[in-house]
A protein has these predicted regions:
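HhH-family (HhH-GPD) DNA N-glycosylase catalytic core used in base-excision repair
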Residues: 2-191
């Protein structure tokens, strides 16, 4: 039928299957290279918010996070005052965890320093892989790691720079979310 796209339900897509928001994320964003500092900062913040929770929970709250945090404009987030951050504790659209909310400002300020040092957040991030995407080319989801030497090194460096909620596992998910790591299975049509 014209205009209808048939999507194969490979094992790769199984973690997103049945939820339109998760499917859209899998198909259009996950493991897709994106060199935009704002987008990379958004993913860093959303991944940090997901600590101890499911990614599905955070994706379903993404619009509220965008509204609350100035669409992740780095400079605006870095300049947020305590009163504004405290007010977000009342926003039912967010995970109302003070440390996670305040981490957005802390991480934005760290990203600003990185931008001054490297020219962009993107250049800093890609410096950990010499500008090359890590393509796992896995055959099964059971092969996909949750941490790597790169995520450990990046996590360590981001922590040294004062960032919060950037452990090596979350950092690995972050690397997937911005396309530095491509963990779509080899048979996934969204590689």
């Amino acid at each position: 039928m014209e205009g209808i796209r048939i999507i194969m339900n490979s094992e790769c897509r199984s973690w997103a299957a049945g939820d339109p928001i998760m499917e859209k994320y899998h198909d259009e964003e996950w493991c897709k290279i994106n060199h935009d500092d704002r987008f990379e900062f958004e993913m860093l913040c959303l991944e940090g918010a997901s600590v101890g929770l499911s990614w599905k929970t955070i994706l379903h709250k993404r619009a509220a996070y965008c509204m609350a945090f100035h669409y992740f404009d780095i400079d605006k987030c870095a300049a947020m005052k305590d009163e504004e951050l405290n007010g977000l504790m009342e926003d039912t659209g967010l995970i109302r965890n003070r440390s996670k909310i305040y981490s957005v400002r802390t991480n934005a300020q760290a990203v600003q320093r990185i931008q001054q040092e490297y020219g962009s957040f993107d250049k800093y991030l890609w410096s950990f892989t010499d500008g090359k995407q890590i393509d796992g080319r896995w055959k099964s989801l059971s092969e996909v790691p949750t941490v790597s030497d790169v995520s450990k090194a990046l996590s360590k460096d981001m922590k040294k720079r004062g960032m919060k909620f950037v452990g090596p596992v979350i950092t690995y998910s972050f690397l997937q979310s911005i396309g530095i790591v491509n963990d779509h299975l080899v048979d996934c049509e969204f590689r």
